[in-house]
Amino acid sequence: MAFQVLFICLISTIVFASILWRKQNKNKTLLPPSPMPLPIIGHLHLLSPTPHQDFHKLSLRYGPIIHLFLGSVPCVVASTAEAAKEFLKTHEPAFSNRPANTVAVETLTYGFQDFLFAPYGPYWKFMKKLCMSELLGGHMLDQFLPVRQXETKKFIKRVLQKGISGEAVDFGGEFITLSNNIVSRMIVSQTSTTEDENEVEEMRKLVKDAAELSGKFNISDFVSFLKRFDLQGFNKRLEKIRDCFDTVLDRIIKQREEERRNKNETVGKREFKDMLDVLFDISEDESSEIKLNKENIKAFILDILIAGTDTSAVTMEWAMAELINNPGVLEKARQEMDAVVGKSRIVEESDIANLPYLQGIVRETLRLHPAGPLLFRESSRRAVVCGYDIPAKTRLFVNVWAIGRDPNHWENPLEFRPERFVENGKSQLDVRGQHYHLLPFGSGRRACPGTSLALQVVHVNLAVLIQCFQWKVDCDNGKVNMEEKAGITLPRAHPIICVPIRRLNPFPVV
């Protein structure tokens, strides 16, 4: 009897909420179309671990701009290039903030001390200028070319050695190691590689786990009274990740402070300043317009380490998956490589401009598998977008994943065809945010500041794998599974395990 009463009360509540919701929608200013929400959870029940796919399905039913309540948080989702342009360009001043009030952001940024999630204001503007002029600018990238070359050679040697011994390569692990070593050397002139293989594996796992947890929907972020309960266990996991990173960062920072105090010979041995040196210079500069504290420095390092490592690694992994599943594309890329570079030396960054088909492969990978499937913004004030009223403090999701698969802009959108970027003048179609049907790195003020670095790393390391090796896939049909899993950077659900077969001998040049 008690169960029946409870059931009747629940149904009555849902019916009442539905009537109230419809009545309120009629009386309010025009919001975008929306499914009917449930009490307390809103539309959370409609989302799976891959929300970009769920948003896409909802947009097919309700339109290019939809309104949702994720718990008590009002959200809008833009799923077409035209809608994205309205939010990211026409109304960019109103959508220049990123939502920072999440457990993951608060925990991994030392209490909102970072750059990537800082509100649009003096601190963010200062750090963005610093990134583009020094930390991730052209001069810094040119300066660290020898670092990227050295890590690429180490990468080739590791893969080659496994091929000689008949051992399979786990692309995910190798790409994480490669990207992490490049980024670590740019930040602190060190790699995560030590004699302790367990420590190396732990660092790789920390980066992957941080990226994965940051992209998962934590119900505590959307239903406020559940925050203290940590129902999914995310809070404890995030704190553990942050504490592990913190131990490493404290050790590195303490060592660097001691070097700078004592003018240690180690400082002189470095050919040029790394990112940590630049950040310390600013923190010690009394005339600097912004004073950086230790938490700002650590939070910035974590921003770059996590974002810079995982995005490049995931992109290279998806690219290899597509090449293995499309052997005709792989062969065409090899032919281009042989014609332009030859077989007597390894491809270099300076060759990339002369390899349009390789560039097409990378762009096609970013179209189908953008490292960030959703762009996150938050409205700082009320805005009217495409005739819809968007209140302040509304969270915006731009579904880059769906936009890249829109048949209105892409012929046969689910087909992996790099030719679409090298035919009919499409080679000028860039990925830096000027073309709103291709937004893998975002657009406008909040576009990814590390785009140039990511493209350099992805192009040249994908190129050496194409040039130097053939691949034997450990499965019956020679294909790899293309399922996605949860994460802020679109990770693969299944690892790619292949045995490398040497195609040309890189030893004379490495």
Curated annotation (Swiss-Prot):
Localization terms from the record: Membrane
TM annotation in the entry: 64-84
Induction line: By fungal elicitor.
Membrane topology according to the record: Single-pass membrane protein
Protein keywords: Heme, Iron, Membrane, Metal-binding, Monooxygenase, Oxidoreductase, Transmembrane, Transmembrane helix
A cellular component annotation (GO) from this entry: membrane
Disulfide bonds: none
Gene Ontology terms for molecular function: heme binding; iron ion binding; oxidoreductase activity, acting on paired donors, with incorporation or reduction of molecular oxygen, NAD(P)H as one donor, and incorporation of one atom of oxygen
EC code: 1.14.-.-
Stored InterPro entries: Cyt_P450, Cyt_P450_CS, Cyt_P450_E_grp-I, Cyt_P450_sf
Cofactor: heme
Chief place of localization: membrane
Residues that coordinate or bind heme: C448
Enzyme class, broadest EC rank: oxidoreductase
Keyword rRNA-binding carried by entry: no
Stated family: Belongs to the cytochrome P450 family.
Name by which UniProt lists this protein: Cytochrome P450 93A3
Native organism: Glycine max
Highest classification ranks of the organism: Eukaryota, Viridiplantae, Streptophyta, Embryophyta, Tracheophyta
Gene label: CYP93A3
